[in-house]
Amino acid sequence: MLETRSGYKSGFISIIGRPNVGKSTFLNRVIGQKIAIMSDKPQTTRNKVQGVLTTTDSQMIFIDTPGIHKPKHKLGDFMLKVAKNTLREVDVIMFMVNAEQKLGKGDEFILEMLAGNSTPVFLVINKIDQIHPDELLGIIESYKERYEFAEIIPISALQGNNVESLLDTLPKYLPEGPQYYPADQVTDHPERFIIYELIREKVLHLTREEIPHSIAVVIDKIRRDEENNDKIHVAATIMVERDSQKGIVIGKRGALLKEVGTRARKDIEMLLGSKVYLELWVKVQKDWRNKSTHLRDFGFRDDEY
């Protein structure tokens, strides 16, 4: 049974927002370790990612959700469902927006979704390092007119500006509760999931156009070498929807796939603390984003959310 220390705060914080506002960058900065995929391409977070930050007097469990948008296929339906489900039974909702972008239809969509909600909502204005300070007041006013936020906090997740102030404020809205996770645990996701995300991140960085949204990764094997315990063999398959996409991911004479492997291997070695032999394959699974069976096979399961 978990013990609750008097005055100790703990709770769950959902991070929501339009695609590409910096939610994963924020989470990785706060946790101090890469656990959420980062890319300049929208819709890169597909599953909710839980990051755990433990201090002497609080434990904050962050849930990074897919960027909220109106879905165009079954995968989009899944991503929106994950985002909505994280709003249930959390203690605080962080609505993150991009200071460089005006309040748009995507933000209105989220504000409508929050209507009638009783959970405290923080408006977190990210990327303030990219605008002139004089612009900030106008941004704040445009959102204040549409929703009664518990707190409005401008930050730069990339540079770290004002992030500590946000982290100091959040526990004030959390209930007293137990320490759910050990102090040194930063995520509840298994290594297999993080390896999957690291490989997909490298593909996103190195490809273009429709390729990113058509990609899934299946981890086929993670096995420690029996003769050399410091070496781990990882085998994974990159799934695409069309033969033309397969050619792009492989690249001329296999150059792009090799670069994906090199970059992913370095991050996986840092994660596991061991030498890694990474074996990558590319396979076509036509129209997988619109087939529920393929979504489940590739790790997108409704019952886990």
UniProtKB/Swiss-Prot annotation:
<feature type="region of interest" description="G4">
    <location>
        <begin position="126"/>
        <end position="129"/>
    </location>
</feature>
<dbReference type="GO" id="GO:0005525">
    <property type="term" value="F:GTP binding"/>
</dbReference>
<dbReference type="Pfam" id="PF01926">
    <property type="entry name" value="MMR_HSR1"/>
</dbReference>
<feature type="region of interest" description="G2">
    <location>
        <begin position="43"/>
        <end position="47"/>
    </location>
</feature>
<dbReference type="InterPro" id="IPR009019">
    <property type="entry name" value="KH_sf_prok-type"/>
</dbReference>
<dbReference type="InterPro" id="IPR030388">
    <property type="entry name" value="G_ERA_dom"/>
</dbReference>
<keyword id="KW-0472">Membrane</keyword>
<feature type="binding site">
    <location>
        <begin position="64"/>
        <end position="68"/>
    </location>
    <ligand>
        <name>GTP</name>
    </ligand>
</feature>
<feature type="domain" description="Era-type G">
    <location>
        <begin position="9"/>
        <end position="176"/>
    </location>
</feature>
<feature type="binding site">
    <location>
        <begin position="126"/>
        <end position="129"/>
    </location>
    <ligand>
        <name>GTP</name>
    </ligand>
</feature>
<dbReference type="GO" id="GO:0003924">
    <property type="term" value="F:GTPase activity"/>
</dbReference>
<feature type="region of interest" description="G3">
    <location>
        <begin position="64"/>
        <end position="67"/>
    </location>
</feature>
<feature type="domain" description="KH type-2">
    <location>
        <begin position="207"/>
        <end position="286"/>
    </location>
</feature>
<dbReference type="GO" id="GO:0043024">
    <property type="term" value="F:ribosomal small subunit binding"/>
</dbReference>
<dbReference type="InterPro" id="IPR015946">
    <property type="entry name" value="KH_dom-like_a/b"/>
</dbReference>
<dbReference type="GO" id="GO:0000028">
    <property type="term" value="P:ribosomal small subunit assembly"/>
</dbReference>
<dbReference type="InterPro" id="IPR005662">
    <property type="entry name" value="GTPase_Era-like"/>
</dbReference>
<comment type="similarity">
    <text>Belongs to the TRAFAC class TrmE-Era-EngA-EngB-Septin-like GTPase superfamily. Era GTPase family.</text>
</comment>
<protein>
    <recommendedName>
        <fullName>GTPase Era</fullName>
    </recommendedName>
</protein>
<dbReference type="InterPro" id="IPR004044">
    <property type="entry name" value="KH_dom_type_2"/>
</dbReference>
<dbReference type="Pfam" id="PF07650">
    <property type="entry name" value="KH_2"/>
</dbReference>
<feature type="region of interest" description="G1">
    <location>
        <begin position="17"/>
        <end position="24"/>
    </location>
</feature>
<dbReference type="InterPro" id="IPR005225">
    <property type="entry name" value="Small_GTP-bd"/>
</dbReference>
<dbReference type="GO" id="GO:0005829">
    <property type="term" value="C:cytosol"/>
</dbReference>
<dbReference type="GO" id="GO:0070181">
    <property type="term" value="F:small ribosomal subunit rRNA binding"/>
</dbReference>
<keyword id="KW-1003">Cell membrane</keyword>
<dbReference type="InterPro" id="IPR027417">
    <property type="entry name" value="P-loop_NTPase"/>
</dbReference>
<keyword id="KW-0963">Cytoplasm</keyword>
<feature type="binding site">
    <location>
        <begin position="17"/>
        <end position="24"/>
    </location>
    <ligand>
        <name>GTP</name>
    </ligand>
</feature>
<dbReference type="GO" id="GO:0005886">
    <property type="term" value="C:plasma membrane"/>
</dbReference>
<keyword id="KW-0694">RNA-binding</keyword>
<keyword id="KW-0342">GTP-binding</keyword>
<comment type="function">
    <text>An essential GTPase that binds both GDP and GTP, with rapid nucleotide exchange. Plays a role in 16S rRNA processing and 30S ribosomal subunit biogenesis and possibly also in cell cycle regulation and energy metabolism.</text>
</comment>
<comment type="subunit">
    <text>Monomer.</text>
</comment>
<keyword id="KW-0690">Ribosome biogenesis</keyword>
<keyword id="KW-0547">Nucleotide-binding</keyword>
<dbReference type="InterPro" id="IPR006073">
    <property type="entry name" value="GTP-bd"/>
</dbReference>
<feature type="region of interest" description="G5">
    <location>
        <begin position="155"/>
        <end position="157"/>
    </location>
</feature>
<keyword id="KW-0699">rRNA-binding</keyword>
